[in-house]
Every structure is written in structure tokens, then in C-alpha cells.
């Protein structure tokens, strides 16, 4: 399986880079992992609703440009469905079983994802009703994908 993590913005924090590198390495035994960063749209601190939509649209265009037509897209969105680790493992197993060899998880910028990206998504996934920093979500997501593969293989790690 080829898994892409498409996220907005460049990762700067060393501790996050180290954690992401560790889980990317671990996942290499199960899947080909590609981490794709698209530039965030530069904007002032205070934005009108129109300006916020413009920023999301620009970032969304960059995300959509990275998606292949045959890729199964899972958008991380607060309005998405919540799953347990076991349910995410079932989703990953189902995708593999039905021949979905390309899966992309999409993480938006600080303002979220554009409507166009959400429409392109085959599934919307929420990790919580709480808001997490989008850069931290990369690490959390990779850990959960790793956990899903371990669960599906019946390997120790889970719990």
C-alpha cells in the first residue's frame, strides 16, 4: 500500500520531525510512506471570513494538485466521523482488500480544509472534537496508522 500524508505548512519543530521520522521508519515495514508538504498561504493574523475562505481555497488548490485521480482520500476534519484504533485498522484492511493501493490522508492548515478538498475526500476522519495543532496531527496520525498495521497483523504494540 502507498500512503501519502499531505499537509499544509513546513514542519519546523525538531521534536515533531524526530517523532515523524521514527514512525515513518517503522511504517516502512508495512507500506510505502510519502510525506508531502504544500506551502501555507501567507496571511495576516486577523482575517475576514472572505479572506479566510481565500486562504483555504489557495491551500486547497495546492493539496488537490498532489492527489492522483485513483487515490482514496481521507480528510482529517473536525466534522468527520470518529473511529477507534480498531476501526481505523478495519478501514485500512478494507482498503487493501478492495485494491485501494493509494491512500492519502490530508491535513489542512490552521484554518482547516477548503470545500473543494472536503468534496474530493472519500472519507472524513476526526480524531476528536478538540482542535489540535495541524503540525502535531502529522505525528498523531502516523502513530495511529502504524498502530492499525500492527493490529491487522496481530503484532504486539496495541493497548
From Swiss-Prot:
Q: Which reaction does it catalyse?
A: pseudouridine(1915) in 23S rRNA + S-adenosyl-L-methionine = N(3)-methylpseudouridine(1915) in 23S rRNA + S-adenosyl-L-homocysteine + H(+)
Listed GO MF terms: rRNA (pseudouridine-N3-)-methyltransferase activity
Is rRNA processing a UniProt keyword of this protein?
yes
Keywords in alphabetical order, please: Cytoplasm, Methyltransferase, rRNA processing, S-adenosyl-L-methionine, Transferase
Q: Which Pfam families match?
A: SPOUT_MTase
Q: Which residues bind S-adenosyl-L-methionine?
A: 76, 108, 127-132
Return the EC number.
2.1.1.177
Record localization:
Cytoplasm
Q: Which GO terms describe its cellular component?
A: cytoplasm
Work out whether the entry's keyword set contains Cytoplasm.
yes
The family database entries (InterPro entries) matched by this protein are listed as: Alpha/beta_knot_MTases, RlmH-like, tRNA_m1G_MTases_N
Q: Which domain of life is it from?
A: Bacteria
| Stated role | Specifically methylates the pseudouridine at position 1915 (m3Psi1915) in 23S rRNA.
Assembly and interaction partners = Homodimer.
Q: Which family does it belong to?
A: Belongs to the RNA methyltransferase RlmH family.
- What is the name of this protein? Ribosomal RNA large subunit methyltransferase H
Native organism: Halalkalibacterium halodurans (strain ATCC BAA-125 / DSM 18197 / FERM 7344 / JCM 9153 / C-125) (Bacillus halodurans)
Q: What is the lineage of its organism?
A: Bacteria, Bacillati, Bacillota, Bacilli, Bacillales
Identify the gene encoding this protein. rlmH
Amino acid at each position: 500500500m502507498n500512503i501519502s500524508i499531505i499537509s499544509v505548512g513546513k514542519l519546523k519543530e525538531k521534536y515533531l520531525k524526530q517523532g515523524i521520522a521514527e514512525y515513518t521508519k517503522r511504517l516502512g515495514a508495512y507500506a510505502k510512506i510519502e510525506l508531502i508538504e504544500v506551502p501555507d498561504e501567507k496571511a495576516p493574523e486577523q482575517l475576514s471570513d472572505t479572506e479566510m475562505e481565500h486562504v483555504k481555497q489557495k491551500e486547497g488548490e495546492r493539496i488537490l494538485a498532489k492527489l492522483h485521480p485513483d487515490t482514496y482520500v481521507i480528510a482529517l476534519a473536525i466534522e468527520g466521523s470518529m473511529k477507534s484504533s480498531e476501526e481505523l485498522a478495519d478501514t485500512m484492511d478494507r482498503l487493501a482488500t478492495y485494491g485501494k493501493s493509494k491512500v492519502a490522508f490530508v491535513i489542512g492548515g490552521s484554518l482547516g480544509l477548503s470545500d473543494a478538498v472536503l468534496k474530493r475526500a472519500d472519507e472524513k476522519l476526526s480524531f476528536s472534537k478538540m482542535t489540535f495543532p495541524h503540525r502535531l496531527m502529522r505525528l498523531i496520525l502516523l502513530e495511529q496508522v502504524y498502530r492499525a498495521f500492527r493490529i491487522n497483523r496481530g503484532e504486539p504494540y496495541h493497548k
